[in-house]
């Protein structure tokens, strides 16, 4: 699902995150609304801190059994680990099955299994029941994001094209990802540069633009993008990865090694990082 990074820049979110993290350090209990807890789960997940996200999900469920947000996160993790049975169990543990996020999760289960005929049937039936214009736009955006997340880009593009607001920034970002997937890097870069001009403080934009430059073997520009991203959020794993890969491309193997090691500290047991570290060590030997 598409996550709005701007949420994490709000002062109320920062206060909640600080209160939770301080409570965890001291062993105290902190109470907050389940929606606020779900935002913290999303933040950790978005930031690549999966263990922290899991810990928050467990804590949230200890206070709010059956709450949708933590179960959605756990189900998506199960899908990522190819454990569809566990994902289905998490889905069915949700109390409020009328919530739109429950529908999205059921749809995602079908998409993850490439049951596109079933997912399309579910989506079309649900879309017919939506009357409010804003709700329709949000639905189309979320469905488009689901398909793009699973590289079903043609289906994702089809639903995104139904949106009335073609200039919606989240829609444009998804379109840029679709273009990247098709190796249409120039058009993807133009979209991202426009988004950055409007809001240069979204580190995800810089990471995606850096990835485009990496695909073009333009490692200088890739590094510039990574450094902008890390100036906004020093510990974001996509930015760290982008910087390390750019350094490899520039021949700065010692710097790349240190950067991959920093990545591995945040994402322990990451096989791809261990491979990159091994490659750097071989080159330095």
Task: Please provide the spans of the model-predicted regions.
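TPR alpha-solenoid repeat register
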Residues: 70, 102, 135-139, 171, ...
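Register position in tetratricopeptide repeats
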Residues: 46, 80, 112, 146-149, ...
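Canonical positions in the second alpha-helix
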Residues: 60, 91-94, 126-129, 159-163, ...
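Short coil turns that delineate tetratricopeptide repeat
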Residues: 65, 97-99, 131-134, 166-168, ...
